[in-house]
From Swiss-Prot:
Stretch list, region Large ATPase domain (RuvB-L): 13-229
Organism name: Trichodesmium erythraeum (strain IMS101)
Subunit field text: Homohexamer. Forms an RuvA(8)-RuvB(12)-Holliday junction (HJ) complex. HJ DNA is sandwiched between 2 RuvA tetramers; dsDNA enters through RuvA and exits via RuvB. An RuvB hexamer assembles on each DNA strand where it exits the tetramer. Each RuvB hexamer is contacted by two RuvA subunits (via domain III) on 2 adjacent RuvB subunits; this complex drives branch migration. In the full resolvosome a probable DNA-RuvA(4)-RuvB(12)-RuvC(2) complex forms which resolves the HJ.
Region span, Head domain (RuvB-H): 303-386
Domain remark in the UniProt entry: Has 3 domains, the large (RuvB-L) and small ATPase (RuvB-S) domains and the C-terminal head (RuvB-H) domain. The head domain binds DNA, while the ATPase domains jointly bind ATP, ADP or are empty depending on the state of the subunit in the translocation cycle. During a single DNA translocation step the structure of each domain remains the same, but their relative positions change.
Catalytic reactions of this protein: ATP + H2O = ADP + phosphate + H(+)
Region span, Small ATPAse domain (RuvB-S): 230-300
InterPro entries on file: AAA+_ATPase, AAA_lid_4, DNA_helicase_Holl-junc_RuvB, P-loop_NTPase, RuvB-like_N, RuvB_C, WH-like_DNA-bd_sf, WH_DNA-bd_sf
Subcellular localization: Cytoplasm
Function: The RuvA-RuvB-RuvC complex processes Holliday junction (HJ) DNA during genetic recombination and DNA repair, while the RuvA-RuvB complex plays an important role in the rescue of blocked DNA replication forks via replication fork reversal (RFR). RuvA specifically binds to HJ cruciform DNA, conferring on it an open structure. The RuvB hexamer acts as an ATP-dependent pump, pulling dsDNA into and through the RuvAB complex. RuvB forms 2 homohexamers on either side of HJ DNA bound by 1 or 2 RuvA tetramers; 4 subunits per hexamer contact DNA at a time.
Name of protein: Holliday junction branch migration complex subunit RuvB
Disulphide linkage map: none
């Protein structure tokens, strides 16, 4: 659910024993009760949230994952424009001895938003706490995170568009003025005061930047989009990962995996592991283009990176709706897939490669999409601009 990286964490500051009511800029109050543990050595509820126990297998997987992740900005492959912007921001913050400005990263999943937050922490030599918006269920969850941050620390919140309104309102003064607005007590005897926070950097990640409220979005000083990767960039990522995994792969083998990776490093690393398994079991080394192609065909990944679900989505639209237009909910009902999954996972890549288009009346399969599945497109699909 969350990771703490880099430096050793200092103990969280003591909180008052009183019932605390958190007040936003609009003076909306939320109750926050502190709970005393049986002993000071016992983890708090927030610490348990941030540092879950991992099994030996999970620890091994995490170690491999950490080795594959680039550790520094100059090791990060691709996203040239983003790296230039962040390099300037890092240099400026270091020269002024300030924390980085708040950063919002948006784009399809798997493009390296979490990795970039860890790199920023490494470059700034600070801690990085990672969590997701759905894990922040109550005001005390975000309060625990904020008060535990040391000077310059980075707080990474994935799926930030899913934050509740009350959590957002707590973040407003925290992001802008590095303070928590709280009200102690209830009724006429209540008193409002501000608790200072140490300067920190909030890094938010989202696949739906349009779903963020304007007050939250406007508090980010840097807003950057992550794009899909080119084949040559993914090839370099795959070759680097193969070295970490002690897997012998040729340049054309890496390129074959890259072509089928949907422009996404996370998928590239996953497919590399499947190809490695195939190579080891079949005793076929080094992994060249032919071996990689055979392995990925076995796992139902075609030369353009489409899997069974992608092809089923296109085929259903062609066979049932003559290629569209069809609404998102109609597509979900016809294929049995979740509408949000179609919109966030499958549709962006199908649109990226020109197999699907959005129109005012719904989604439409393009002529290229028809041909990829072996169908002859009707005249109306031929007229669509690709």
């Amino acid at each position: 659910m969350a990771i703490i990286s880099s430096k050793k964490q200092s103990p969280q500051p003591e909180r008052p024993d009183d019932d605390i009511f958190l007040a936003s800029e609009n003076q909306v109050s939320y109750k926050y009760k502190t709970k005393k543990s049986k002993s000071q050595a016992q983890r708090s509820e927030v610490e348990a949230l941030l540092e879950p126990e991992a099994s030996a297998a999970e620890k091994s997987d995490n170690q491999n994952e950490e080795k594959i992740r680039p550790q520094r900005l100059d090791e990060y492959i691709g996203q040239k424009d983003l790296k230039e912007v962040l390099n300037i921001a890092i240099s400026a913050a270091k020269s002024r001895k300030e924390s980085l400005d708040h950063l919002l990263l948006y784009g399809p999943p798997g493009l390296g938003k979490t990795t970039m937050s860890l790199i920023l922490a490494a470059e700034m030599e600070v801690n990085c706490k990672i969590t997701t918006a759905p894990a922040i269920e109550k005001p005390r969850d975000i309060v625990g995170l904020l008060v535990g941050l040391q000077k310059g620390d980075i707080l990474f919140i994935d799926e930030i568009h899913r934050l509740s309104k009350m959590t957002e309102e707590i973040l407003y003064p925290a992001m802008e003025d590095f303070r928590l607005d709280i009200t102690v007590g209830q009724g006429k005897s209540s008193k409002t005061r501000s608790i200072p926070l140490k300067p920190f950097t909030l890094v938010g990640a989202t696949t739906k930047v349009g779903s963020l409220t304007s007050p939250l979005r406007d508090r980010f000083g840097i807003i950057q989009r992550l794009r899909f990767y080119e084949v040559d960039e993914l090839s370099l990522i795959i070759i680097r990962a193969a070295k970490v995994l002690n897997t012998d792969i040729t340049e054309d083998g890496a390129e074959e995996v890259a072509r089928r990776s949907r422009g996404t490093p996370r998928i590239a690393n996953r497919l590399l592991r499947r190809v490695r398994d195939y190579s080891e079991v079949k005793k076929l080394t080094p992994i060249n283009a032919e071996i990689a192609g055979e392995a990925l065909e076995l796992f139902n990944v075609d030369p353009l990176g489409l899997d069974w679900t992608d092809r089923n989505l296109l085929r259903t639209m062609i066979e049932n709706y003559n290629g569209g237009p069809a609404g998102l909910e109609t597509m979900a009902a016809a294929t049995g897939e979740d509408a949000q999954t179609i919109e966030e996972v499958y549709e962006p890549y199908l649109m990226q490669i020109g197999f699907m288009q959005r129109t005012p009346r719904g989604r439409v399969v393009t002529a290229a999409g028809w041909r990829h599945l072996g169908f002859s497109p009707p005249d109306e699909q031929l007229s669509l601009k690709l």
